[in-house]
Amino acid sequence: LLEDSFGRQFHYLRLSVTEACNFRCQYCLPDGYDGPSSDHFMSLPEIDTLLKAFARLGTSKVRLTGGEPTLRRDFLDILHLTASTPGIERVAMTTHGARMEKFAANWKAAGLHQVNVSIDSLDPRQFAAITGQDKLKAVLRGLDAAIDCGLDVKVNSVLLNDFSDSRLQRFLAWLKEMPVTLRFIELMETGDLHQFFNKQHQSGSPLKATLMKMGWQPLIRRKDAGPAQEFYHPDYAGRIGLIMPYSKDFCKSCNRLRVSAPGKLHLCLFSENGIDMRELLAGGNVDEVVLFLQKVLGQKHETHYLHEGKTGATKHLAMLGG
Protein backbone atom coordinates (compact mmCIF):
# COMPACT_ATOMS: atom_id res chain seq x y z
CA LEU A 1 0.00 0.00 0.00
CA LEU A 2 1.00 3.60 -0.57
CA GLU A 3 1.35 5.18 2.86
CA ASP A 4 3.05 8.41 3.93
CA SER A 5 4.97 9.22 7.11
CA PHE A 6 1.75 10.45 8.78
CA GLY A 7 -0.01 7.08 8.37
CA ARG A 8 -2.30 8.26 5.57
CA GLN A 9 -3.04 5.63 2.92
CA PHE A 10 -3.62 6.57 -0.70
CA HIS A 11 -6.28 4.59 -2.55
CA TYR A 12 -7.17 7.37 -4.98
CA LEU A 13 -5.31 8.80 -8.00
CA ARG A 14 -6.37 12.01 -9.74
CA LEU A 15 -4.89 11.80 -13.22
CA SER A 16 -4.89 14.90 -15.41
CA VAL A 17 -4.78 13.98 -19.11
CA THR A 18 -4.67 17.53 -20.54
CA GLU A 19 -4.37 21.13 -19.37
CA ALA A 20 -6.45 22.44 -22.28
CA CYS A 21 -10.02 23.65 -21.77
CA ASN A 22 -12.48 25.47 -24.03
CA PHE A 23 -14.33 27.16 -21.13
CA ARG A 24 -13.03 30.36 -19.52
CA CYS A 25 -14.14 30.02 -15.89
CA GLN A 26 -13.37 33.10 -13.81
CA TYR A 27 -11.72 31.08 -11.03
CA CYS A 28 -9.57 28.93 -13.33
CA LEU A 29 -8.75 30.16 -16.87
CA PRO A 30 -10.46 33.56 -17.19
CA ASP A 31 -8.38 34.44 -20.27
CA GLY A 32 -8.78 31.02 -21.89
CA TYR A 33 -6.18 28.31 -22.41
CA ASP A 34 -2.87 29.36 -23.94
CA GLY A 35 -0.61 26.50 -22.89
CA PRO A 36 1.36 23.71 -24.55
CA SER A 37 -0.08 21.50 -27.30
CA SER A 38 -1.21 17.91 -26.82
CA ASP A 39 2.19 16.34 -27.62
CA HIS A 40 3.41 17.85 -24.33
CA PHE A 41 1.14 15.48 -22.38
CA MET A 42 1.54 11.82 -21.47
CA SER A 43 0.94 9.25 -24.20
CA LEU A 44 -1.34 6.24 -23.87
CA PRO A 45 1.58 3.81 -23.19
CA GLU A 46 2.95 6.16 -20.50
CA ILE A 47 -0.48 6.36 -18.87
CA ASP A 48 -0.69 2.55 -19.00
CA THR A 49 2.62 2.20 -17.12
CA LEU A 50 1.52 4.77 -14.55
CA LEU A 51 -1.84 3.09 -13.90
CA LYS A 52 -0.29 -0.36 -13.50
CA ALA A 53 2.21 0.96 -10.94
CA PHE A 54 -0.43 2.76 -8.88
CA ALA A 55 -2.79 -0.23 -9.02
CA ARG A 56 -0.02 -2.53 -7.80
CA LEU A 57 0.39 -0.23 -4.79
CA GLY A 58 -3.28 -0.43 -3.81
CA THR A 59 -4.88 2.39 -5.80
CA SER A 60 -8.48 1.34 -6.37
CA LYS A 61 -10.04 4.59 -7.65
CA VAL A 62 -8.90 6.80 -10.52
CA ARG A 63 -10.40 10.13 -11.54
CA LEU A 64 -9.58 11.47 -15.00
CA THR A 65 -9.38 15.26 -15.00
CA GLY A 66 -8.01 18.10 -17.12
CA GLY A 67 -8.28 20.86 -18.11
CA GLU A 68 -11.23 19.32 -19.92
CA PRO A 69 -10.34 15.63 -20.37
CA THR A 70 -12.77 15.05 -23.24
CA LEU A 71 -10.73 17.38 -25.47
CA ARG A 72 -8.19 14.58 -25.89
CA ARG A 73 -8.90 12.70 -29.11
CA ASP A 74 -7.93 9.43 -27.41
CA PHE A 75 -10.03 10.08 -24.29
CA LEU A 76 -12.20 7.00 -24.85
CA ASP A 77 -9.04 4.88 -25.14
CA ILE A 78 -7.72 6.35 -21.87
CA LEU A 79 -11.04 5.62 -20.19
CA HIS A 80 -11.11 2.02 -21.40
CA LEU A 81 -7.46 1.51 -20.40
CA THR A 82 -8.13 2.83 -16.89
CA ALA A 83 -11.22 0.69 -16.38
CA SER A 84 -9.46 -2.46 -17.60
CA THR A 85 -6.38 -2.07 -15.36
CA PRO A 86 -6.43 -4.90 -12.77
CA GLY A 87 -7.01 -3.47 -9.28
CA ILE A 88 -8.81 -0.32 -10.41
CA GLU A 89 -12.35 -0.78 -9.10
CA ARG A 90 -13.86 2.66 -9.65
CA VAL A 91 -13.31 5.11 -12.51
CA ALA A 92 -14.54 8.70 -12.32
CA MET A 93 -14.07 11.82 -14.41
CA THR A 94 -14.53 15.57 -14.02
CA THR A 95 -15.91 17.52 -16.97
CA HIS A 96 -17.63 20.79 -17.86
CA GLY A 97 -20.35 18.57 -19.31
CA ALA A 98 -20.85 20.27 -22.67
CA ARG A 99 -20.15 17.02 -24.58
CA MET A 100 -21.93 14.71 -22.16
CA GLU A 101 -25.30 14.48 -23.91
CA LYS A 102 -23.59 12.99 -26.96
CA PHE A 103 -21.01 10.77 -25.24
CA ALA A 104 -22.30 9.71 -21.78
CA ALA A 105 -23.43 6.27 -22.97
CA ASN A 106 -20.05 5.68 -24.69
CA TRP A 107 -18.20 6.62 -21.51
CA LYS A 108 -20.37 4.26 -19.47
CA ALA A 109 -19.71 1.44 -21.97
CA ALA A 110 -15.95 2.08 -21.73
CA GLY A 111 -16.05 1.51 -17.96
CA LEU A 112 -16.88 4.87 -16.36
CA HIS A 113 -18.74 4.71 -13.02
CA GLN A 114 -19.00 8.34 -11.93
CA VAL A 115 -19.00 11.77 -13.52
CA ASN A 116 -18.52 15.11 -11.77
CA VAL A 117 -19.88 18.10 -13.68
CA SER A 118 -19.12 21.76 -12.99
CA ILE A 119 -22.28 23.89 -12.73
CA ASP A 120 -21.75 27.18 -10.93
CA SER A 121 -25.25 28.55 -11.46
CA LEU A 122 -28.63 27.36 -12.73
CA ASP A 123 -29.29 30.82 -14.14
CA PRO A 124 -28.19 30.81 -17.82
CA ARG A 125 -26.87 34.39 -17.71
CA GLN A 126 -24.90 33.81 -14.50
CA PHE A 127 -23.56 30.54 -15.88
CA ALA A 128 -22.34 32.29 -19.03
CA ALA A 129 -20.81 35.12 -16.98
CA ILE A 130 -18.83 32.66 -14.82
CA THR A 131 -17.77 30.20 -17.54
CA GLY A 132 -17.52 32.36 -20.64
CA GLN A 133 -19.82 29.89 -22.44
CA ASP A 134 -23.60 30.04 -22.94
CA LYS A 135 -23.96 26.27 -22.57
CA LEU A 136 -26.07 25.68 -19.46
CA LYS A 137 -28.93 24.00 -21.34
CA ALA A 138 -26.52 21.63 -23.10
CA VAL A 139 -24.87 20.75 -19.78
CA LEU A 140 -28.24 20.06 -18.11
CA ARG A 141 -29.27 17.82 -21.02
CA GLY A 142 -25.95 16.04 -20.54
CA LEU A 143 -26.73 15.49 -16.86
CA ASP A 144 -30.01 13.83 -17.80
CA ALA A 145 -28.18 11.61 -20.31
CA ALA A 146 -25.63 10.58 -17.66
CA ILE A 147 -28.35 9.72 -15.15
CA ASP A 148 -30.36 7.84 -17.79
CA CYS A 149 -27.42 5.58 -18.66
CA GLY A 150 -26.75 4.75 -15.01
CA LEU A 151 -23.75 6.90 -14.15
CA ASP A 152 -23.29 8.16 -10.60
CA VAL A 153 -23.54 11.94 -11.03
CA LYS A 154 -22.09 14.70 -8.85
CA VAL A 155 -22.27 18.42 -9.53
CA ASN A 156 -19.51 20.80 -8.44
CA SER A 157 -20.30 24.44 -7.71
CA VAL A 158 -17.70 26.95 -6.53
CA LEU A 159 -18.78 29.29 -3.71
CA LEU A 160 -18.37 32.88 -4.92
CA ASN A 161 -19.41 36.10 -3.17
CA ASP A 162 -20.89 37.57 -6.37
CA PHE A 163 -23.34 34.80 -7.07
CA SER A 164 -24.22 33.20 -3.74
CA ASP A 165 -27.47 34.79 -2.52
CA SER A 166 -29.98 33.59 -5.09
CA ARG A 167 -28.09 30.44 -6.03
CA LEU A 168 -28.86 28.33 -2.96
CA GLN A 169 -32.66 28.52 -3.22
CA ARG A 170 -32.55 27.72 -6.92
CA PHE A 171 -30.23 24.76 -6.34
CA LEU A 172 -32.37 23.47 -3.44
CA ALA A 173 -35.53 23.56 -5.56
CA TRP A 174 -33.63 21.66 -8.27
CA LEU A 175 -32.40 19.00 -5.80
CA LYS A 176 -35.98 18.17 -4.77
CA GLU A 177 -36.27 16.00 -7.89
CA MET A 178 -32.67 15.55 -9.13
CA PRO A 179 -30.89 12.42 -7.79
CA VAL A 180 -27.42 13.97 -7.80
CA THR A 181 -24.93 15.09 -5.17
CA LEU A 182 -24.33 18.85 -5.35
CA ARG A 183 -21.00 19.85 -3.79
CA PHE A 184 -20.29 23.46 -2.90
CA ILE A 185 -16.53 24.05 -3.01
CA GLU A 186 -14.71 26.90 -1.30
CA LEU A 187 -12.70 28.98 -3.76
CA MET A 188 -9.00 28.08 -3.45
CA GLU A 189 -6.19 30.55 -3.96
CA THR A 190 -3.86 29.80 -6.88
CA GLY A 191 -0.78 31.61 -8.13
CA ASP A 192 -2.52 33.50 -10.95
CA LEU A 193 -5.63 34.62 -9.06
CA HIS A 194 -4.71 36.39 -5.80
CA GLN A 195 -6.97 39.41 -6.40
CA PHE A 196 -9.91 37.31 -7.52
CA PHE A 197 -9.54 35.12 -4.44
CA ASN A 198 -9.44 38.09 -2.06
CA LYS A 199 -12.59 39.52 -3.64
CA GLN A 200 -14.60 36.32 -4.08
CA HIS A 201 -13.60 33.81 -1.37
CA GLN A 202 -16.45 32.77 0.88
CA SER A 203 -16.26 30.29 3.75
CA GLY A 204 -18.54 27.27 3.59
CA SER A 205 -19.25 27.37 7.34
CA PRO A 206 -22.31 29.69 7.18
CA LEU A 207 -23.81 27.49 4.44
CA LYS A 208 -23.24 24.40 6.60
CA ALA A 209 -25.06 26.08 9.51
CA THR A 210 -27.95 27.03 7.20
CA LEU A 211 -28.29 23.45 5.93
CA MET A 212 -28.26 21.99 9.45
CA LYS A 213 -31.02 24.42 10.49
CA MET A 214 -33.06 23.26 7.50
CA GLY A 215 -32.82 19.64 8.66
CA TRP A 216 -30.01 18.31 6.46
CA GLN A 217 -28.16 15.43 8.18
CA PRO A 218 -24.48 14.39 7.75
CA LEU A 219 -23.58 11.12 5.97
CA ILE A 220 -20.76 8.72 6.90
CA ARG A 221 -17.80 8.84 4.45
CA ARG A 222 -16.66 5.91 2.29
CA LYS A 223 -13.02 4.74 2.29
CA ASP A 224 -12.34 6.10 -1.20
CA ALA A 225 -14.52 9.20 -0.81
CA GLY A 226 -13.29 12.68 -1.55
CA PRO A 227 -12.96 15.46 1.02
CA ALA A 228 -16.62 16.51 0.94
CA GLN A 229 -18.76 16.51 4.06
CA GLU A 230 -22.03 15.15 2.64
CA PHE A 231 -25.59 15.78 3.85
CA TYR A 232 -28.99 14.26 3.04
CA HIS A 233 -32.59 15.32 3.66
CA PRO A 234 -35.61 12.97 3.51
CA ASP A 235 -37.59 15.47 1.41
CA TYR A 236 -34.94 15.75 -1.33
CA ALA A 237 -33.91 13.36 -4.11
CA GLY A 238 -30.42 14.87 -4.17
CA ARG A 239 -27.67 15.34 -1.59
CA ILE A 240 -25.40 18.25 -0.73
CA GLY A 241 -21.67 18.17 -0.10
CA LEU A 242 -19.34 20.83 1.26
CA ILE A 243 -15.63 20.95 0.42
CA MET A 244 -13.87 23.38 2.74
CA PRO A 245 -10.08 23.21 2.28
CA TYR A 246 -9.52 26.05 4.75
CA SER A 247 -11.25 24.19 7.59
CA LYS A 248 -9.36 22.64 10.50
CA ASP A 249 -8.03 19.10 9.92
CA PHE A 250 -8.99 19.11 6.21
CA CYS A 251 -5.75 17.32 5.28
CA LYS A 252 -6.02 14.57 7.91
CA SER A 253 -8.30 12.49 5.71
CA CYS A 254 -6.25 13.01 2.51
CA ASN A 255 -6.38 9.82 0.46
CA ARG A 256 -5.32 10.98 -3.01
CA LEU A 257 -2.26 11.70 -5.10
CA ARG A 258 -2.16 13.68 -8.34
CA VAL A 259 -0.29 13.29 -11.60
CA SER A 260 -0.35 16.17 -14.07
CA ALA A 261 -0.81 15.76 -17.82
CA PRO A 262 2.94 16.30 -18.51
CA GLY A 263 3.71 13.43 -16.10
CA LYS A 264 4.61 15.16 -12.84
CA LEU A 265 3.65 13.62 -9.50
CA HIS A 266 2.10 16.20 -7.16
CA LEU A 267 1.98 15.02 -3.56
CA CYS A 268 -0.48 17.86 -2.86
CA LEU A 269 -2.63 20.11 -5.04
CA PHE A 270 -0.66 23.01 -3.55
CA SER A 271 2.85 21.50 -3.34
CA GLU A 272 5.75 23.75 -4.29
CA ASN A 273 6.65 21.62 -7.29
CA GLY A 274 5.81 18.42 -9.09
CA ILE A 275 8.22 15.49 -9.31
CA ASP A 276 8.92 14.66 -12.94
CA MET A 277 8.15 11.03 -13.81
CA ARG A 278 8.06 11.35 -17.60
CA GLU A 279 11.40 9.69 -18.35
CA LEU A 280 10.57 6.83 -15.99
CA LEU A 281 7.14 6.35 -17.56
CA ALA A 282 8.57 6.44 -21.09
CA GLY A 283 10.84 3.54 -20.11
CA GLY A 284 7.76 1.42 -19.48
CA ASN A 285 9.20 -0.45 -16.47
CA VAL A 286 6.35 -0.77 -13.96
CA ASP A 287 8.66 -2.12 -11.21
CA GLU A 288 10.83 1.00 -11.39
CA VAL A 289 7.79 3.28 -11.13
CA VAL A 290 6.54 1.32 -8.11
CA LEU A 291 9.90 1.76 -6.32
CA PHE A 292 9.95 5.46 -7.21
CA LEU A 293 6.47 6.05 -5.79
CA GLN A 294 7.28 4.24 -2.55
CA LYS A 295 10.43 6.30 -2.15
CA VAL A 296 9.00 9.78 -2.80
CA LEU A 297 5.87 9.47 -0.67
CA GLY A 298 7.92 10.28 2.43
CA GLN A 299 8.21 13.84 1.06
CA LYS A 300 4.46 14.50 1.42
CA HIS A 301 3.72 17.25 3.96
CA GLU A 302 1.15 17.04 6.73
CA THR A 303 -0.92 19.95 5.38
CA HIS A 304 -1.36 22.18 2.31
CA TYR A 305 -0.47 25.42 4.23
CA LEU A 306 -3.25 27.30 2.38
CA HIS A 307 -4.22 28.93 5.66
CA GLU A 308 -0.75 30.54 5.67
CA GLY A 309 -1.35 32.01 2.22
CA LYS A 310 0.90 29.53 0.40
CA THR A 311 -0.40 28.41 -3.00
CA GLY A 312 2.55 26.34 -4.19
CA ALA A 313 3.31 25.79 -7.86
CA THR A 314 -0.34 25.59 -8.96
CA LYS A 315 -0.81 28.66 -11.18
CA HIS A 316 -4.38 27.71 -12.07
CA LEU A 317 -6.62 24.71 -11.42
CA ALA A 318 -6.53 23.55 -15.06
CA MET A 319 -2.97 22.36 -14.39
CA LEU A 320 -4.22 19.59 -12.11
CA GLY A 321 -8.00 19.59 -12.35
CA GLY A 322 -8.50 20.21 -8.64
Question: Model regions: which residues?
Answer:
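Radical SAM/AdoMet-radical enzyme domain recognition
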Residues: 44-64, 68-185
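Canonical Radical SAM [4Fe-4S] cluster-binding loop centered on the CxxxCxxC motif
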Residues: 5-45, 269
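Glycine-centered loop/turn positions within well-structured domains
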Residues: 23, 124-125, 249, 275
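A short acidic, helix-capping loop that chelates divalent metal ions and anchors anionic groups
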Residues: 33-37, 101, 123-130, 191-195, ...
